[in-house]
Amino acid sequence: MPYGDVTAIPTKDVEAVIVSKGEGVLAGVGVVKILFDLAEIVVMESKKDGEPIKPGDVVMRLRGKSDSILATERLAINILMRMSGIATATAKMVERARRVNPKVVVAATRKTTPGFRIFEKMAVEIGGGDAHRFSLSDCLMLKDNHIAVAGSLERAMKVKRSFTKKLEVEVGSVGDAIKAAEFGADIIMLDNFTPEMVAEAVEELRRRGLREKVIIEVSGSVTPENVAEFAAMDVDVISSGYITHSAPALDFSLRVLQ
């Protein structure tokens, strides 16, 4: 068959295990089980999404035709590697952020792999984060280009609103953060702010009696190394593209048992 394993020997019934080669948070088990079901491979036992794993852990035990197992091996492992890497990176950022701000939410962005967004967002949630938006239709969100097209922040914020969707406004300065709050934004995204700028914006909103009226989100160049610094600034949400575009994959291998 096209894209089958051209080197496979005649098929026979075999058992196999998928083994972790790294330490982190397991994700993708539910997705891979669907793949194996389609290939008529029986999952005899498995760990669950969200479980901690370490090198040498058997995460799945399989039984099926050897040609089916070999044909699905790489796709299954790639899914586990990618999703577990994202879940692990998310869990690390959540732990570091909540160490200094127990209520802060760590969220993903739309900086995802084409065609794989739903699984990457799923992995973020397994790691303890928030999926944030899946598409432009999920939230009224005014970004810099929307404001540029409208001509000004004031004009952009006249967008038709609905009680079913919050309005989020991306700002690049403390002054615009104040304007957005005064114009009725529900969520203010402080984009590419330094921690010092975040602290200034939060304090100015508080001084004007606006802090409790808005959700403050920080975004832009947030990594595991600096997430705690931003979390300490009394923000509500920290969104990071890192967890989907730069999270290291967690390695796995499949072994056919003799």
Swiss-Prot record:
It catalyses: nicotinate beta-D-ribonucleotide + CO2 + diphosphate = quinolinate + 5-phospho-alpha-D-ribose 1-diphosphate + 2 H(+). GO terms for cellular component: cytoplasm. Substrate binds at R74, T109, R110, K111, R133, K143, E170, D191, S219, G220, S221, S240, G241, Y242. SUPFAM superfamilies: Nicotinate/Quinolinate PRTase C-terminal domain-like, Nicotinate/Quinolinate PRTase N-terminal domain-like. It is an enzyme of class 2 (transferase). Keywords: Glycosyltransferase, Pyridine nucleotide biosynthesis, Transferase. GO terms for molecular function: nicotinate-nucleotide diphosphorylase (carboxylating) activity. Pathway: Cofactor biosynthesis; NAD(+) biosynthesis; nicotinate D-ribonucleotide from quinolinate: step 1/1. Gene3D superfamilies: Aldolase class I (3.20.20.70), Quinolinate phosphoribosyl transferase, N-terminal domain (3.90.1170.20). The keyword GTP-binding does not apply. One of its GO terms (biological process) is NAD biosynthetic process. Pfam families: QRPTase_C (PF01729), QRPTase_N (PF02749). InterPro entries: Aldolase_TIM (IPR013785), NadC (IPR004393), NadC/ModD (IPR027277), Nicotinate_pribotase-like_C (IPR036068), Quinolinate_PRibosylTase_N_sf (IPR037128), Quinolinate_PRibosylTrfase_C (IPR002638), Quinolinate_PRibosylTrfase_N (IPR022412). Its EC number is 2.4.2.19. CDD domains: QPRTase. Hexamer formed by 3 homodimers. Involved in the catabolism of quinolinic acid (QA). Belongs to the NadC/ModD family. This is Probable nicotinate-nucleotide pyrophosphorylase [carboxylating].
